[in-house]
């Protein structure tokens, strides 16, 4: 008789880190409430905007997708805070030392944290966008967005692109916030930086008198560039194409994650 030894190999460090971070996420109430806030804010504000919109002629010039997804403007703030606190709470509670003791490979831990954050944010974003789109489909036809006024369908390819892009946008904002929080290691400072980055570019662009400078600010600001992906009318007049705008947000996110990873790698915890 031959005996075959069964060797149990330990899980890959990344798998262990993902499991540990997922356990943290689902046992802490804060992230759940923040992600619920993303859904509630996005859908509520979007439905209110749809109810307030009015199209009485074929030349009203209102983009129904942008109206339906108006709630993303406040909803992204909740996504940003969720991203910041995913890292910020580690530093404020002192858990960072235990986390890095359990997972000595810092970059492995960091990208496990990012991966675990991505999944629930993506789900919450999809629910928020789907709820907003449904509200728009139910409300906007009664507000004049009908074939008679040039709105043949609210489920055309451009509308589906706007919805998919909005989901990706919210997810990228959460990851951008995670990177900023890892770089500065202070939740309040990180939240201020992220919200400033999002909301100040459009404000400054609206105040400057130079049209070229204003357009440039719209092209590089993550909010103004990223939310161009919602546009279904007047696309040719946008500072960037919808997918180019989302690409700008992806670049901001990649830069923030890189800074956060470098700070975690080379600075003491």
Task: Place the predicted regions along the sequence by residue.
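Transmembrane helix boundary and interhelical loop/hinge segments in multi-pass membrane proteins
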Residues: 83-107, 114
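Transmembrane helix segments
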Residues: 187-223
